[in-house]
Amino acid sequence: YLEFEILMDFVFSNRDRHLTNISVLRDADSLKFISLAPIYDSGKSMMVGRDIVPLTDKYVLSQEAKGFKDNEIELLKYVQNRNLVDINKLPKVDYIKEMYLKDSQTSEERIKFVCEMYERKVDMLDKFASGADLRAIRNP
């Protein structure tokens, strides 16, 4: 479960994963445990609160994280099954853009930044799943 969570946090640039924001799903009537919640407390995702900057591989792979480790690259060290996330099932960037366009408060520049970051993260996840050492990409 935590490996999946780490990979999803990487794709969505969630930088606030710690033990108090991992949750479970329970049956509403019996309160019986169903499973761990696949995505929970992801409010600090998708570059929220981040400055819009030119995107480089180094920037994409240098995102800070709070909680278990200080950055995403360090968290990825805990992932043994690199193929847990089926990239083909992730939302397409057009869908991400469509959702952001519904918010009149979000600038076109911010939407472009978020979408480009998301595309690069999906690409990096694909490389990671294929065995690439992302630290080598970040620090050539």
Give a label for each model feature:
Residues 1-14, 19, 23-140:
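Anionic ligand-binding catalytic core segments
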